[in-house]
Amino acid sequence: MIKTEYYKDLTKMNTFGMKVKARCFMEYDSVADLVDIEFEDLARPVLHIGGGSNLLFTDDFKGTVLHSRINFIEILDVPGNTDTSCHPEHSEESPTPVLVSVGAGVIFDDFCDWAAKEGLWGAENLSYIPGEVGASAIQNIGAYGVEVKDIIHKVYCYDTVEEEFVSFSLEECGYGYRDSIFKKPEIKGRYIVTHVVFALSREAKPQLGYGHLRDAVMASVAGVSDDPRLLQRHPLAEGGMSQETPATEAHDPRVTPAVIRRVIIKIRKEKLPEPSVMGSAGSFFMNPVISADHYQKIEAAAKAELGVDYKVPHYDLPDGTVKVPAAWMIEQCGWKGKRSGGAAVYDKQPLVIVNYTGDAYPEEIIGLERRIIASVKAKFGVELHPEVDHI
């Protein structure tokens, strides 16, 4: 069934809580509904949203907003399946992956919760990321050393131009850091994700190399503490990265997907604002990737300013470049906790810009964004780029 509303209030459909309306809003329940939508006749522009967690509406939307309610989670029955090509991680020696088909309208954290309860590995580190499954495959969401591309097998879509259903393999999705083929300007908006097939595992595969995540998880299973501040000893507790430590130790059977999920949820709740209480889009900026020489200059300046023993948080990439957390740069520029009108930099996580008063204007958020970008550029010679889409 397709439900159409005009001049729909979108305040509760974007996590920033921007008080905007859409000229036309269409919500559909099934894959078959997409065939019945006359895309050529829709008011332009056309925007498909998920949970509205990565958007900043700058004004009322003068076109059509689409939203999926395709809601199912299903383990695919593939008896005798020997296809280990669904993900590079799997080989002939490793167990056959568990393929799970999930509707685009499923809340992503509901999928993570389901997987953990089923004892399936792969999605636990992505727990509590806001948004829906369809948008996760477009954005390539990630957290705590894992990106959604690490568990995607195939993405199924409706091609609004050719009016046909198509699928994209992992390789065809062209995933990069918070990027995919679906975000390329030449095809952005053409494909509507209907469902995603994930490749999970029944074999224990904990990814605990991020910051002090391993410490927090092991403390939890040992009954020492569930305190998320265990992870805060690392300056990149959320929104950054650390040099991963190899998981060479034997797997502790007490560590399950549910345990890791519980710890990560505690950490995220401690570090990030609850959208229902204080609007935000989560991480506002992407972490910049710079040359090794540029990083050395930043590190030298930091040691001169903060002491010779100071270590700039970073992650060395395979191609020789270095990823430095935007959160660290923003905090070093003095923005943590600063307000500008109704907008503010979150006092517990400088990577997050919040709708502090609940009625911030888009211009206030954009103004704060621009000032942060300018100050980071002036201090570090690095240009930050927003992760949030400006609509």
Regions found by a protein language model. Give the residues of each.
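Phosphate/pyrophosphate- and phosphate-bearing ligand-binding catalytic cores of soluble enzymes
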Residues: E5-Y7, T11-M18, L55, V166-D227, ...
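Short hydrophobic-aromatic micro-motifs
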Residues: M26, L56, V65-L66, V100-V102, ...
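Structural preference for long, well-ordered alpha-helical segments within the folded cores
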Residues: L368-R371, S375
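A cross-taxon signal for low-complexity, glycine/charged-rich
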Residues: G80, H90-S101, A219-R254
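Beta-rich strand-turn-strand
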Residues: L120, P362-L368
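Residue-level signal for inorganic ion chemistry
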Residues: S30, G52, G131, E163, ...
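Anion-binding (especially nucleotide phosphate/pyrophosphate-binding) glycine-rich loop
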Residues: M1-V155, D159-E162, E172
